Swiss-Prot record:
Gene that this polypeptide is encoded by: atp9
Role, per record: Mitochondrial membrane ATP synthase (F(1)F(0) ATP synthase or Complex V) produces ATP from ADP in the presence of a proton gradient across the membrane which is generated by electron transport complexes of the respiratory chain. F-type ATPases consist of two structural domains, F(1) - containing the extramembraneous catalytic core and F(0) - containing the membrane proton channel, linked together by a central stalk and a peripheral stalk. During catalysis, ATP synthesis in the catalytic domain of F(1) is coupled via a rotary mechanism of the central stalk subunits to proton translocation.
Name of the protein: ATP synthase subunit 9, mitochondrial
Subcellular location per the Swiss-Prot or TrEMBL entry: Mitochondrion membrane
Alphabetical list of PANTHER family matching this protein: ATP SYNTHASE LIPID-BINDING PROTEIN, MITOCHONDRIAL, ATPASE PROTEIN 9
Length: 88
């Protein structure tokens, strides 16, 4: 009887750990929404600025690409953390 109880407790503990991994990975993936919003803001500002002053398009495009890269880097870090939590 004691062995059965220990096995059930071990299975319950294993299920709780798996649940914690899935919840943690989901919470870590929330950072991807911020990256998506950041990219949208960067390109909205770029389009608005080019509309106001088309002569600065080349300079503004470089800055927009820099903003895009930084926003996506944060999103990729969030995705990496999510995968690390889920598969480790």
């Amino acid at each position: 009887m004691k062995n059965i109880v220990k096995i059930e407790q071990l299975e319950l503990a294993s299920a709780v750990v798996e649940l914690g991994k899935k919840v943690g990975a989901g919470l870590a993936a929330i950072g991807l929404t911020g990256a998506g919003a950041g990219v949208g803001i960067v390109f909205a500002a770029f389009i608005l600025a080019v509309g106001m002053n088309p002569n600065l398009r080349g300079e503004l495009f470089k800055l927009a690409m820099l903003g895009f890269a930084l926003s996506e880097a944060v999103g990729l870090l969030a995705l990496m953390m999510s995968f690390l939590i889920l598969y480790s």
